[in-house]
């Protein structure tokens, strides 16, 4: 993609005003930047590695949107891959900038001198403060990087990658690409019968399923036992994944109908609103049924990471159906792609906010107190975030659940320290884990 042309009056210089190319406004790009900081910041408060990986993957997308913009699906996809590609083009751009600074008497040597003075001041005052307070000295020691040969190599590699990323980001901010013109080829429309008949048939099928679901919801477990011959938990487990797939596929069907259905006549527009509106409303009932099934299943067998994550995904799909319903009624959906990504990021941040590993541990500890059933082996595999909840277990279950977490080490370095691990260390210091506890073998759900 070619960068946007220079703003008028700048004579083709590199100083192009961000947002001058029709990309999302500064407020939208600032929102993506804030989302990126929040996603990366999850690692400073949560110890769950699986959660941080998901947040980093989402941050890759939001970083591209913050730097490059993009409103259409294709533009948003391209913005994701632009930052690493921009690094190569940023190198000659940075070289020209440094040459211009030297010509103006502001060479790179003065920048290095400023950095050297800053490091010197930090070193002198850091040594004085460390010698004055032992606690501050321990904190500073934990934050200092490893100065061994392997440590220096690791940190040098990291800073080179970070510097390259920052350079590419600076290039995109000063020379934003024009992504709003990236749209797919116009889709050919089909005749009314070719899209209305399949949608009407699908609406009828959804309506029949929804009637059955309402019967189950109001009839309860007795109705399921009489008609399906299954326990309520087995019934819930058997259908959740299918309903999750139905929810995702329905969104694809709606997207295809919106793309290929004609809207030239008033009759076509009314049919789109009625058929797609009905499908969207019925899909919300399917989402509610899936969520109810997962609730029953979790109450019967306990909470796990997978069950909590797919529940979050199902809530997100329900929100998408609401947004799609609004777009169908208005027959406008240009804002939907950004809201799809935005709501996904919000759902992920919401999952991080509830502290999923601790939430899972608390749910299972409460369930143990009510039923006496507990999967100690699974809980022992949770992260340090779960320690405050697992600390409520009686011995020897407490030590059995916390032993592997405590043995993982303090992890106080700059790259691994976070709030979750700090809380766990404090609890282990106050209530050490018993190394000689005998762990029961048959605590499974």
Predicted regions and their residues:
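Extracytosolic and intramembrane catalytic regions of membrane-associated proteins
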Residues: 385-445
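Hydrophobic alpha-helical transmembrane segments in integral membrane proteins
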Residues: 333-337, 349-374
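Transmembrane-helix bundle segments that line or gate the permeation/cavity pathway
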Residues: 1-138, 154-178
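Structural detector for internal amphipathic alpha-helices that build alpha-solenoid repeat scaffolds
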Residues: 372-381, 389-393
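Alpha-helical transmembrane segments and their membrane-interface junctions
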Residues: 119-135, 205-222, 287-296
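Hydrophobic membrane-spanning alpha-helices of multi-pass integral membrane proteins
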Residues: 28-38, 117-123, 203-207, 245-251, ...
């Amino acid at each position: 993609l070619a960068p946007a042309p220079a703003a008028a009056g700048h004579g083709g210089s590199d100083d192009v005003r961000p947002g001058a190319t029709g990309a999302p406004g500064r407020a939208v790009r600032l929102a993506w930047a804030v989302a990126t900081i929040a996603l990366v910041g999850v690692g400073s408060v949560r110890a769950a590695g699986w959660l941080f990986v998901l947040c980093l993957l989402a941050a890759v997308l939001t970083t591209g949107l913050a730097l490059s913009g993009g409103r259409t699906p294709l533009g948003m996809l391209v913005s994701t891959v632009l930052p690493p590609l921009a690094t190569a083009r940023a190198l000659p751009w940075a070289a020209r900038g440094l040459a211009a600074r030297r010509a103006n008497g502001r060479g790179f040597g003065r920048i290095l001198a400023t950095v050297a003075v800053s490091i010197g001041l930090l070193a002198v005052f850091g040594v004085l403060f460390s010698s004055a307070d032992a606690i501050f000295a321990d904190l500073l020691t934990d934050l200092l990087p490893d100065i061994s040969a392997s440590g220096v190599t690791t940190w040098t590699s990291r800073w080179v990658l970070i510097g390259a990323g920052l350079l590419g980001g600076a290039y995109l901010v000063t020379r934003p690409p024009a992504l709003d013109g990236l749209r797919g080829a116009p889709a050919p429309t089909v005749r009314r019968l070719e899209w209305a008949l399949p949608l009407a048939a699908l609406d009828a099928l959804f309506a029949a399923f929804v009637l059955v679901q309402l019967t189950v919801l109001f009839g309860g477990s007795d109705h399921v036992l009489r008609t399906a011959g299954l326990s309520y938990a087995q019934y819930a487990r058997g259908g959740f994944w299918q309903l999750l797939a139905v929810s995702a596929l329905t969104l694809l069907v709606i997207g295809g109908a919106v793309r290929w259905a004609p809207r030239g006549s008033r009759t076509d527009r009314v049919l789109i609103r009625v058929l797609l509106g009905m499908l969207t409303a019925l899909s919300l009932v399917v989402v509610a049924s899936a969520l109810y099934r997962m609730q029953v299943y979790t109450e019967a067998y306990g909470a796990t990471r997978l069950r909590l994550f797919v529940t979050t995904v199902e809530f997100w799909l329900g929100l998408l159906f609401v947004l799609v319903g609004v777009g169908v009624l208005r027959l406008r959906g240009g804002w939907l792609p950004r809201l799809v990504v935005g709501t996904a990021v919000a759902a992920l941040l919401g999952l991080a906010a509830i502290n999923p590993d601790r939430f899972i541990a608390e749910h299972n500890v409460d369930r143990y107190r009510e039923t006496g059933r507990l999967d100690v082996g699974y809980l022992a595999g949770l992260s340090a975030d779960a320690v405050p909840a697992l600390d409520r277990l009686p011995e020897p279950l407490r030590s059995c659940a916390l032993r592997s977490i405590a043995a993982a080490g303090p992890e106080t370095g700059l790259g691994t320290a976070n709030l979750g691990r700090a809380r766990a260390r404090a609890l282990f210091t106050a209530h050490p884990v018993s190394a000689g506890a005998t762990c029961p073998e048959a605590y499974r759900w």
